[in-house]
């Protein structure tokens, strides 16, 4: 998924050197048709959340500008990731994901590096287990803090009433 239109040109150049490797990218070039099939192995899609997840589920590796949601989706699906951040929030996402072993960070879509990384990548299933437990972790945290919070809230309300 790319938000910088210049990245599309980089992908086209890379594809010319590696025409046998299938590439599916999503971009926000609204002036283009919804699906731009350059040839049998290069396709650009307009942003489409359903198609995006369908393509990601079947991909060998994922290259992105490091948006939070798509990085989490790739981690959940166990995909090796190359992150090419375009601004500070994405820099933070890329840094955090690389620390967790989810992928590599680059200044450009150097897809050779991603393919090399993908060969030895081992998904960390702990992330999936953590996500699946998220609801229970949150409920547990809320229950542990509910009694103390309620008491504090009522005390503050009582104090407010005294001043009225």
Language-model segment annotations:
Residues 1-58:
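Donor-nucleotide binding loops and adjacent catalytic segments primarily
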Residues 16-19, 75, 98:
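Anion (oxyanion) recognition and catalysis
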Residues 33-38, 44, 80-123:
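Nucleotide-sugar donor-binding patch of glycosyltransferase catalytic domains
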Residues 116-164:
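C-terminal amphipathic helix plus adjacent low-complexity
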Residues 54-93:
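A donor-sugar binding/catalytic signature common to diverse glycosyltransferases
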Residues 14, 55, 114-117, 141:
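CheY-like receiver
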Residues 7-8, 48-49, 67, 90, ...:
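Amphipathic coiled-coil/heptad-repeat helices and related helical stalk/stem segments
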Residues 2-4, 66, 85, 130:
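Small/polar loops that bind or transfer phosphate-bearing groups
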């Amino acid at each position: 998924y790319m938000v910088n239109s210049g990245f599309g040109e980089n992908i086209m150049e890379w594809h010319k050197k590696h025409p046998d490797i299938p590439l599916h990218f999503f971009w926000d070039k609204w002036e283009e048709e919804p699906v731009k099939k350059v040839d049998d192995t290069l396709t650009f899609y307009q942003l489409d959340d359903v198609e995006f997840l369908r393509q990601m589920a079947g991909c060998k590796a994922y290259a992105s500008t490091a948006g939070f949601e798509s990085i989490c989706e790739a981690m959940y699906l166990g995909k090796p990731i190359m992150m090419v951040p375009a601004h500070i929030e994405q820099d933070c996402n890329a840094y955090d994901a690389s620390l967790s072993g989810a992928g590599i960070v680059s200044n450009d879509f150097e897809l050779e590096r991603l393919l090399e990384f993908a060969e030895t990548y081992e998904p960390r299933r702990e992330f999936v287990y953590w996500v699946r437990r998220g609801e229970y972790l949150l409920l547990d945290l809320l229950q542990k803090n509910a009694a103390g919070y309620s008491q504090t809230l009522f005390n503050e309300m009582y104090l407010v009433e005294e001043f009225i």
